[in-house]
């Protein structure tokens, strides 16, 4: 297994990037499909996702869907189920790791340069150089 800690390489636009978002896989839960519809336009716009990446995005959306499904189930319980809570935490960790992999977190977006402001910081006395 590859060592995943430390500084990650910068994400760059891919020559084979998708230009149109494919429909959400039919087997995903409604919450997972909603997440697919939320993130795919961002990924397509940044040109960092290829057809080969779709399984990873599908796994990310499935993990988010599972987190929401468990949360809904736990909200109906008078006392939270610790086993369900542990399962939810594992799904959250998986979703967070996959989100970072595809540029869906603030730090990973900065590597892509997708959310960087275009304005010039020359006049900013607090700018780090």
Question: What would you call each of these model-derived segments?
Answer:
Residues 60-67, 74-118, 129:
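Amphipathic alpha-helical protein-protein interaction segments
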Residues 25-76:
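An amphipathic, hydrophobic-aromatic interaction surface with interspersed Lys/Arg
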Residues 6, 47-48, 103:
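Glycine-centered secondary-structure boundary/capping sites
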Residues 1-37, 108-129:
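Arg/Lys-rich, low-complexity, intrinsically disordered N-terminal tails that contact nucleic acids
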């Amino acid at each position: 297994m590859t060592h995943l800690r430390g500084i990650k390489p910068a994400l760059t636009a891919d020559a084979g990037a998708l230009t149109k978002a494919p429909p959400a896989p039919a087997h995903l839960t409604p919450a997972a499909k909603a997440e697919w519809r939320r993130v795919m336009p961002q990924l397509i716009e940044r040109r960092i996702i290829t057809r080969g990446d779709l399984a990873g995005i599908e796994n990310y959306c499935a993990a988010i869907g599972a987190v929401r499904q468990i949360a809904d189930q736990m909200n109906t319980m008078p006392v939270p189920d610790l086993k369900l809570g542990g399962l939810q935490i594992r799904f959250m960790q998986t979703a967070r790791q996959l989100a970072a992999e595809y540029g869906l977190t603030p730090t990973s977006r900065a590597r892509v340069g997708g959310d960087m402001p275009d304005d010039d910081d020359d006049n900013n006395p607090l700018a780090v150089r």
